[in-house]
Amino acid sequence: MAEKRDYYEVLGVSKNATDDELKKAYRKKAIQYHPDKNPGDKEAEEHFKEVAEAYDVLSDPEKRSRYDQFGHAGLGGAAGGGFSGGGMSMEDIFSRFGDLFGGFGGFGGFSDMGGSSRRRVRRGSDLRVRVKLSLADISKGVEKKVKVKKQVVCSKCRGDGTEEANGKTTCQTCHGTGVVTRVSNTFLGAMQTQSTCPTCHGEGEIITKPCSKCKGEGVEIGEEVISFHIPAGVAEGMQMSVNGKGNAAPRGGVNGDLIVVIAEEPDPNLIRNGNDLIYNLLISVPLAIKGGSVEVPTIDGRAKIRIEAGTQPGKMLRLRNKGLPSVNGYGTGDQLVNVNVYIPESIDAKDEQAIAAMENSDSFKPTDAARKDIDKKYREMLD
């Protein structure tokens, strides 16, 4: 599957599907492509991983929100929580979602799969960073680097949690499977359920000689410089994830994600309104009367615009496609130029004479039509 499909399409649900609808859709698809039902079928196995990846994202409110905002780009190019490049291992999928299959249809989803057991795979916690972006960054997308303090794999035990090679023993409660199985008789017949082993907490092993540096946790505090790409069109408060760059998990689990929260830096000239940009242009009285050309700043430089003779304060000019791109790639906003006329608070004697001459000119006397036009615009603004 060279190109990722839409996750809602993968599960066959609408974009406003409820949690129950997602769970039912995932269960149906996963059973359809389950390896026990399709032994040796690589295509079915890939579909099985794909539906697990889709459910992992859409069943998590935060990941789903990022996916709805950014698409696959908001998940660091892959699904969150361990779906890296082509998906989780089969063992990871069964560990995370296997409880959805318990006692259903004759197979619980936990067959050996070539010798693997359903040991619990822990996940490291997510990290959050706030990244400030200029409008120029937002207009084109940008590469960023952040230095974070986080949990990393223990440098002494390499994440194993033991002081020496033979520092673990197989859990005697679950015999290394990480789960305990219970069989109960119901009117439908014998039902088998599985739950996490209470002794080893799903790991299948007990540490007898913990690492002296990490005390058996398999992690320590370290630093990492993380690089990531922020797509064009993001907005204040939006979030995206960098897959697997959060805290390391205890004893060889799945890393958490780095959650990047977008913060917009104020621009000295432009004001953002959705994907449109607004520039407040202040022109002189003579320019408003005579008309002429002026330059205005844009997101990528400057643009020359024409001021028509008799331009009124509040007139809005539009520069097509000079705004910001949509984060989902659907079109580009415009730049709006809000024209205002500068009225000086004081003038010198020479200017007073010029103003006095204009007062007697019919050209400078307000007309009833002009007043009605202002009245119409004001009423439209109030509606």
Swiss-Prot record:
PROSITE patterns found in the cross-reference section: DNAJ_1, DNAJ_2, ZF_CR
Coiled coil: none
Cofactor note: Binds 2 Zn(2+) ions per monomer.
Binding site for Zn(2+) 2: C171, C174, C197, C200
Pfam families: DnaJ, DnaJ_C, DnaJ_CXXCXGXG
Cofactor(s) this protein cannot do without: Zn(2+)
Subcellular location, record wording: Cytoplasm
Zinc finger (CR-type): 141-223
Domain of life: Bacteria
Mapped CXXCXGXG motif repeat ranges: 154-161, 171-178, 197-204, 211-218
GO cellular component, one term: cytoplasm
Residue ranges of domain J in the record: 6-71
SMART domains per the UniProt record, alphabetical: DnaJ
GO molecular function terms attached to this record: ATP binding; heat shock protein binding; unfolded protein binding; zinc ion binding
Gene Ontology BP, a term: DNA replication
Entry binding sites for Zn(2+) 1: C154, C157, C211, C214
Claim: Magnesium is one of the keywords in the record: no
SUPFAM superfamilies assigned to the protein according to its UniProt record, in alphabetical order: Chaperone J-domain, DnaJ/Hsp40 cysteine-rich domain, HSP40/DnaJ peptide-binding domain
Entry annotated with the keyword Cytoplasm: yes
CDD domains per UniProt: DnaJ (cd06257), DnaJ_C (cd10747), DnaJ_zf (cd10719)
Entry domain remark: The J domain is necessary and sufficient to stimulate DnaK ATPase activity. Zinc center 1 plays an important role in the autonomous, DnaK-independent chaperone activity of DnaJ. Zinc center 2 is essential for interaction with DnaK and for DnaJ activity.
Assembly notes: Homodimer.
Protein family membership: Belongs to the DnaJ family.
Protein known as: Chaperone protein DnaJ
Primary gene name: dnaJ
